[in-house]
Design a protein with these regions (language model features):
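Positively charged n-region of N-terminal signal peptides that target proteins for export
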Residues: 1-4
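Beta-strand-enriched cores of mature, soluble protein domains
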Residues: 43-45, 60, 70-72, 174-223, ...
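N-terminal intrinsically disordered, cationic/polar leader segments
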Residues: 55, 73, 81-116, 121-123
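Short helix-loop boundary/capping segments
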Residues: 139-203
Length: 329
């Protein structure tokens, strides 16, 4: 799926969008770059610790390499929510090194919301705690919101897409965030609670295959009652190497079957995360993570007609009830 100039032009002209010189150029630059991030990709995640920052800490010599014994692929599809907001929904699945799909590995991965001139974002300020921040004093920014697997909050940052480089890039120098799932799930880490991320995304053109890169220069951070303690610096790269769309047929089918539920889920979260106050989560004792229960809820409504108003409202109520169960009073 290549960038679509006609769609970009439509977004610029539609919805009564104001056009004003530099503002228009930044909007167009971002829209074109974000559309190039869609399609079928081989995804290569690689992370390594490079510098201990806390006295007495011994650097972990292991390299996180997602493709060591398999191939991770993602189908990334765009949903245009408004002329200034695009959602990139990712479906992650695995194949063996010979290229054969591992059945049942398809999973709804993170969503990425990109919004131009967003009025606010939610800063991660402590484990399970996010605080809204007003962005209106600084216009002309693209806000990137990376969600949990169930569209809940993870981390957000606002910056401009470059306008003077051969390939568009978007850089966020400091973005406090929860500990990544790759660390707790795959690396068995529980000795720190947060990651201070420095991210740079570079989107390459068609002559480079239409691939893109996310560079990360992060600080693993202990977050305790005494504040933040830097533990160790890590470097990482997420390469998205474009593949023919046919290699993501399974991920595409997985997404199509669930699109109606995902849209309703996103709309429900939009109603809650309106910037009016903090959002604080909790995990009820003895319960699995919220996303696991949301996956179960999703499976229970597959095949139901969510365009039917009664079914839609019932499903929305179930989503809200589940979110509230994991929300601190």
């Amino acid at each position: 799926m290549r960038a679509r100039p006609a769609l970009v032009a439509l977004l610029l002209l539609g919805g009564g969008l104001p056009v004003a010189g530099a503002d228009d150029a930044q909007l167009a630059r971002g829209l074109q770059a974000i559309q190039r991030m869609t399609g079928c990709f081989l995804v290569d995640y690689s992370y390594v610790e490079v510098q201990a920052l806390k006295p007495g800490y011994v650097r972990d010599p292991r390299v996180y390499d997602v493709n060591r014994d398999k191939s991770a692929k993602e189908w990334i599809v765009a949903e245009t929510i408004s002329p200034r907001r695009i959602r990139l929904q990712r479906v992650l699945f695995l194949a063996d090194l010979a290229g054969a799909l591992r059945p049942g590995t398809e999973v709804r991965h993170q969503s990425e919301d990109w919004e131009y001139d967003a009025p606010f974002l939610y800063d991660f300020v402590a484990p399970l705690h996010w605080q809204p921040r007003d962005l209106r004093p600084t216009p002309g920014l693209w806000t990137r919101r990376v969600t949990n697997l169930d569209d809940g909050l993870r981390y957000q940052c606002a910056a401009r897409w470059s306008e003077d480089t051969a390939y568009p890039d978007w850089a966020c120098p400091s973005n406090y965030a929860p500990i990544p799932g790759r660390e707790t799930r795959d690396m068995g880490r529980s000795d720190y609670q947060a990651l201070d991320r420095s991210t740079r995304i570079v989107v390459y053109g068609a002559s480079q295959g239409g691939s893109w890169l996310e560079r990360q220069d992060n600080v693993k951070t202990i977050h305790g009652d005494g504040g933040r303690v830097p533990l160790v610096r890590e470097l990482g790269k997420n390469w998205y190497v474009r593949l023919p769309d046919s290699e993501c047929a399974g991920g595409r089918a997985f997404a199509e079957r669930r699109r109606a539920f995902w849209t309703l889920l996103r709309e429900t979260w939009d109603g809650l995360l309106d910037g009016s106050g903090p959002f604080v989560e909790r995990t009820p004792p003895g319960q699995p993570p919220r996303f696991a229960k949301m996956f179960d809820l999703e499976d229970s409504v597959l095949g139901r007609d969510l365009s039917d108003e009664a079914t839609r409202q019932e499903t929305r109520r179930r989503i809200l009830d589940l979110i509230q169960q994991y929300r601190a009073p």
